């Protein structure tokens, strides 16, 4: 179970389904489902109660006669709706011997109902351009869809159907259990997960169910795997209207939306709620210590103190304390541990839980610092809280950060709905009404009292990760991969083909409203300042926030020879001190008002980002301008950054990679196989990167900055609650004095890479303690963003593996055969030729079979092509889901910046759907022949040896 990085996220939720962006249509469900014991129409029985609370949030609370609670909030900034159902059941409701049951049940909720065959739920959402997912937490299980607002009824029908009528077919259960095992193994690949979930929490909780992992103990999962009745009985005990909350936020009329929910959910009778006694955790009366030892490179320290549950009087003080300790570079732990070289990273805080949980400190030691020394540093900071009151400035900054977070979350319908649902599902539906008032009432004396009450040695659990050396041994041979593609036949799914065809014919929906956003979109404005800096502004006055994104043509492609990483270090140093402000002053200036600025490296450019409330937009601009125009490159900060970079490289040695994170072992080997040294997309090995990082000097960074940071290669995009003319004036005031050099910019050229004359040999990276194997297959795809067939190629890639559940790879490898939890394929088009790649995360014993199916599916697609139906469904998804990315100011800004970067035009967002819809089947088939080459790719195997 992944621990949230901040307590504002839903409590300890597990991202269970490989973040499926799934499409859907409405049909196959009957107009009304008959429950075994149906209630009379809620509209007729007079027991529907509805009222509006939290005037600032405009939330309407409705109670149906069957006990279902509905929370609805209108938000009309984008034509989308976030629809979710929160069940008040999670791993805390399980019993010993059946742990993991909630998570298995969540997986099976996607495997069909009495009316919907396996695969139909995903199919329906995908073909309607929606995103669907679910998470299992300790206290709740959460199902949610982000979809065009005119598809709200689809979400309600499907969620109501599977609340009552999920089927739990034994064959589907057998397939899905392999996927669950793969997910469990993938989690345990991470030493951090293993330390927190399998070591630290079980030590901290001896009696309460927070003792066990949300995904379950492996032995329990195996015991439940074959027992359909146990899973079904658990479903019937917990999935019922009177144990659920529906939350919907988006572009709808409240009365109509509630009527839709009443129509589909109101027909079900309330269930008999299980009287399940949760054993409370007794007071801890002595320090507990545990140690995890496994192969790895970097240690880790966790310290947890028992604290009260969410909503308890001291909970609000603990939230403030979390900000003081961990929120930003000005926070106490960063200043005391990271700035002083004890820690590579350090943070901590409390989490939202129904029952008393922990205030957790989490730190990673710097090189040559022991876990014990780092623990002493953490303890010193806790003692400081107990002996000295926090300053008025710290207290005010923490409160401003919390207030800003409340404002920022209203940028997104998803975040608004998640916060509402999280608290309603733990029976605190009005939590947000009074939260800010209670936070504002916290005093320095409260902080000191709470620290003295809870942060005591007898109340804490300490966990160390002590990495062990990797055992010596030669890499095993790669798994055999058959090459008999000629015998391949078209793939069909006998369980689904006829039913899904009938479903599509029955529904035959009009194009989702999100697929044609041109009519309602505001028009951005583009201005070029006299110094060449490009400014794009789009107004959105729905929420008093502003998002900024941008870039400077100063990426890693310009790194000097033998000093890879200069560009990244230069970008990172810009926020670590200017000629007018220290790193701490820069951080505190922004953090004191809950704003933020980021500058990071990239392959082709340095990337800029920022966010603030409207009232602080001027501060955001002036800080970014100071960092871009007047960096000081202080020597002490550079050495600190060098040490952190080296520690990060050591961390990468224990990461199998393959999931999209740059710098991990599989991605490094993959990039080295595809691109020659010196190419912008080539990546050094960890050893090479360490040597380069040690060799880079301050003079290298200053020289790079003076050469490549210039206004005429800079783009700034601003979206939010600003007036275009005012924003342009403010940007010109902040950046207009940045002089353009007389010399022209450095050439921006990404060279072509010739196709390999022979297929590279597979590469094996052995991490013996990893329970899962990551497989990365691919080649230089030959596609650029400017390629005329870019859109046809993306349709081809989507059909192959663009979705975990709706693609050919996903359906065959995960859904039908249960061989992998994570399955994906992509064809990247950049300024240069990007990679084609397929990623699989699988158990070592399934690796050879999964690879064989992958090759077979590729060969079948190349030999037989794709169907017109597949092309239509791909278009529906690719056009329908795109505007879902535009629900936030940051999302819109990112798309406008990309359109500028690739010279797509200011109207690209409005035109994008037409560009996809214009692609013909013949163009897709041609793209398959051009870009799909199953026999040419390199194979990277990382993790446990494939069997």
State where each predicted segment sits:
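Non-catalytic, conformational "gating/processing" segments within enzyme and secreted inhibitor domains
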Residues: 177, 230-263, 459, 651, ...
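M16 family metallopeptidases and their MPP-like homologs
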Residues: 73, 77-96, 100-104, 118-163, ...
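Short, glycine/charge-rich beta-strand/loop segments that flank catalytic centers
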Residues: 138-144, 171-182, 603-610, 636-647
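Short, conserved secondary-structure transition motifs
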Residues: 181-187, 280-294, 398-409, 612-613, ...
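Proteolytic maturation boundary segments
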Residues: 34-71, 253-293, 300, 335, ...
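Gram-negative bacterial Sec-dependent N-terminal signal peptides
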Residues: 2-33
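Histidine-acidic residue clusters that define the catalytic metal-binding segment
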Residues: 43-61, 201-244, 276-281, 309, ...
């Amino acid at each position: 179970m992944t621990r949230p990085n901040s307590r504002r996220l839903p409590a300890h939720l597990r991202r269970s389904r490989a973040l499926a962006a799934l499409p859907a249509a409405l049909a196959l469900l009957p107009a009304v489902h008959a429950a075994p014991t149906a209630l009379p129409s809620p509209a007729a029985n007079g027991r529907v109660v509805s009222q509006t609370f939290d005037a600032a949030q405009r939330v309407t609370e409705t109670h149906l006669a069957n006990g279902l609670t509905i929370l609805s909030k209108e938000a009309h900034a984008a034509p989308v709706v976030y629809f979710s159902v929160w069940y008040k059941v999670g791993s805390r409701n399980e019993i010993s011997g059946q742990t993991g049951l909630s998570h298995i049940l969540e997986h099976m909720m996607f495997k069909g109902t009495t009316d919907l065959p396996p695969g139909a739920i995903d199919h329906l959402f995908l073909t309607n351009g929606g995103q669907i997912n679910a998470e299992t937490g300790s206290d709740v299980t959460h199902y949610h869809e982000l979809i065009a607002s005119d598809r709200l009824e689809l979400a309600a029908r499907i969620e109501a159907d599977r609340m009552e009528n999920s089927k739990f077919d034994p064959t589907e259960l057998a397939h899905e259990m392999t996927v669950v095992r793969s997910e469990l193994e993938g989690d345990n690949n991470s030493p951090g997960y293993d330390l927190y979930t399998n070591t630290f929490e079980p030590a901290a909780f001896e009696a309460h169910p927070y003792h066990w992992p949300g995904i379950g103990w492996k032995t329990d999962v195996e015991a439940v795997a074959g027992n359909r009745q146990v899973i079904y009985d658990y479903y019937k005990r917990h999935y019922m209207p009177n144990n659920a909350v529906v939350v919907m936020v988006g572009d709808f009329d409240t009365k109509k939306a509630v009527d839709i929910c009443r129509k589909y959910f109101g027909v079900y009778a309330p269930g008999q709620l299980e009287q399940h006694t949760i054993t409370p955790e007794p007071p801890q009366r002595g320090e507990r210590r545990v140690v995890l030892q496994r192969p790895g490179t970097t240690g880790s320290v966790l310290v947890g103190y028992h604290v009260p549950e969410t909503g308890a009087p001291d909970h609000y003080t603990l939230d403030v304390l979390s900000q003081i300790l961990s929120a930003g570079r000005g926070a106490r732990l960063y200043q005391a541990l990271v700035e002083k070289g004890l820690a590579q990273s350090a943070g901590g805080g409390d989490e939202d839980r129904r029952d008393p949980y922990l205030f957790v400190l989490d730190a990673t030691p710097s090189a040559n610092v022991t876990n014990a020394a780092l623990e002493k540093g953490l303890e010193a900071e806790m003692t400081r809280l107990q002996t000295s009151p926090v300053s008025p400035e710290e207290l005010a900054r923490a409160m401003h950060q919390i207030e800003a977070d409340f404002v920022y979350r209203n940028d997104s319908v998803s975040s608004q709905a998640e916060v509402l649902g999280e608290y309603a599902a733990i029976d605190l539906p009005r939590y947000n009404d009074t939260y800010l008032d209670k936070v504002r009432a916290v005093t320095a004396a409260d902080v000191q009292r709470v620290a003295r009450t809870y942060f005591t040695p007898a109340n804490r659990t300490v966990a160390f990760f002590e990495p062990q050396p990797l055992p010596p041994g030669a890499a095993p041979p790669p798994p055999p991969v058959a090459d008999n593609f000629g015998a391949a036949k078209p793939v069909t799914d006998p369980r689904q083909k006829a039913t899904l065809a009938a479903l599509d014919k029955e529904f035959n929906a009009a194009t989702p409203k999100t697929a044609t956003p041109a009519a309602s979109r505001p028009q951005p404005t583009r201005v070029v300042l006299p110094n060449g800096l490009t400014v794009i502004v789009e107004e959105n006055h729905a929420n008093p926030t502003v998002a900024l994104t941008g870039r400077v043509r100063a990426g890693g492609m310009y790194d000097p020879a033998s000093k890879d990483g200069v560009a990244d270090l230069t970008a990172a140093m810009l926020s670590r001190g200017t000629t007018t402000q220290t790193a701490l002053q820069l951080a505190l200036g922004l953090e004191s008002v809950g704003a933020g600025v980021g500058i990071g490296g990239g392959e082709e450019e340095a990337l800029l980002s920022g966010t603030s409330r409207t009232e602080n937009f001027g501060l955001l601009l002036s800080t970014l301008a100071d960092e871009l125009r007047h960096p000081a490159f202080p020597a002490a900060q550079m050495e600190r950054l060098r040490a952190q970079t080296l520690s990060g490289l050591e961390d990468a040695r224990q990461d199998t990679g393959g999931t999209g994170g740059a710098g991990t072992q599989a991605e490094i080997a993959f990039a080295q196989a595809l691109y020659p040294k010196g190419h912008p997309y080539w990546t050094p090995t960890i050893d090479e990167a360490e040597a380069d990082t040690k060799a880079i000097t301050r003079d290298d960074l200053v020289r790079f900055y003076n050469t490549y940071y210039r206004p005429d290669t800079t783009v700034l995009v601003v979206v939010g609650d600003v007036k275009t003319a005012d924003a342009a004036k403010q940007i010109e005031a902040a950046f207009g004095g940045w002089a353009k050099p007389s010399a022209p910019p450095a050439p921006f050229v990404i060279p072509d890479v010739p196709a390999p004359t022979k297929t590279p040999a597979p590469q094996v990276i052995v991490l013996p303690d990893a329970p899962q194997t990551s497989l990365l297959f691919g080649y230089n795809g030959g596609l650029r963003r400017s390629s005329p067939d870019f859109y046809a190629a993306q349709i081809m890639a989507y059909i192959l593996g663009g979705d975990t559940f709706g693609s050919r790879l996903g359906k065959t490898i995960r859904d039908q055969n249960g061989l992998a939890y994570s399955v994906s394929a992509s064809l990247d088009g950049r300024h240069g030729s990007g990679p084609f790649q397929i990623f699989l995360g699988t158990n070592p014993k399934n690796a050879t079979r999964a690879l064989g199916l992958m090759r077979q599916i590729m060969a079948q697609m190349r030999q037989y092509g794709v169907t017109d139906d597949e092309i239509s469904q791909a278009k529906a998804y690719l056009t329908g889901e795109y505007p879902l990315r535009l629900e936030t100011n940051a999302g819109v800004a990112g798309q406008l910046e990309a359109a500028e970067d690739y010279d797509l035009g200011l109207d690209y967002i409005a035109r994008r759907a037409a560009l996809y819809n214009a692609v013909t089947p013949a163009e897709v088939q041609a793209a398959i022949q051009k870009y799909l080459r199953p026999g040419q790719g390199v194979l990277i195997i990382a993790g446990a040896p494939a069997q």
